[in-house]
Amino acid sequence: MPKVDVYDINGKVVGEINLRDDIFGIEVNKHAIHQVIVNQLANRRQGTQSTKTKSEVRGGGRKPWRQKGTGRARHGSIRSAQWVKGGIALGPKPRSYKYAVPKKLRRLALKSALSSKVNENELLVLDSLNFDEIKTKQMANVLKNLKVNDTTAVLVLADKNRNVELSARNIPGLKTLFVNTMNVYDIIRHDKFIITKDAVAKVEEVYA
């Protein structure tokens, strides 16, 4: 059972917490992580790319010259794909790139991502995180105290907290998530994984 230190907002160790083996201590499955990240990025694609075919390009309705007798190659339209300003053959059209992956695979990938953060000592547990007012400087000081102010980090909260969310919004390299919006791509993409103690309890409740 992985055991990690619990920090306060001043960066001091105030205790320890035991994390569940079946969530934070599994063997990392890199293939599952890769599959889920590819799926996430594919689902984010707009799919609005488009090209015009020969029939959609303006002009080219008349045969440029007669079929025989000119000595030149035969052509039926100046908008064929081989012509300058011609249509595109087999070009991209608007489409959806979305596809689904099995729920078990998503869960395995998420647990693998969390376990990798524990293995690499990149997971930090905060005792609590609450601000009386919206203040970016307060959040910046917390990151500085935790020694993660010069790297990228994802912050996971148990529930919505407006003051914390807005205080973190303008800090470069910091992304705020909640237990229900936690995802493999953001966990892997950021160097550090910061999570509050009550969020750990919620993660273990949801993914046990």
Curated annotation (Swiss-Prot):
GO cellular component: ribonucleoprotein complex; ribosome
SUPFAM superfamilies to which the protein is assigned, alphabetical: Ribosomal protein L4
Pfam families referenced in this protein's UniProt entry, alphabetically: Ribosomal_L4
UniProt superkingdom: Bacteria
Keywords tagged on the record: Ribonucleoprotein, Ribosomal protein, RNA-binding, rRNA-binding
Cystine bridges: none
Gene3D superfamilies for the chain: 3.40.1370.10
A GO molecular-function descriptor: structural constituent of ribosome
Basic residues bias (residue ranges): 60-76
One GO BP annotation of this record: translation
Disordered: region residues: 44-76
Free-text function comment from the UniProt entry: One of the primary rRNA binding proteins, this protein initially binds near the 5'-end of the 23S rRNA. It is important during the early stages of 50S assembly. It makes multiple contacts with different domains of the 23S rRNA in the assembled 50S subunit and ribosome.
Family as reported in the entry's similarity comment: Belongs to the universal ribosomal protein uL4 family.
Subunit and interaction comment: Part of the 50S ribosomal subunit.
Protein name: Large ribosomal subunit protein uL4
Species assigned in the record: Acetivibrio thermocellus (strain ATCC 27405 / DSM 1237 / JCM 9322 / NBRC 103400 / NCIMB 10682 / NRRL B-4536 / VPI 7372) (Clostridium thermocellum)
Recorded name of the encoding gene: rplD
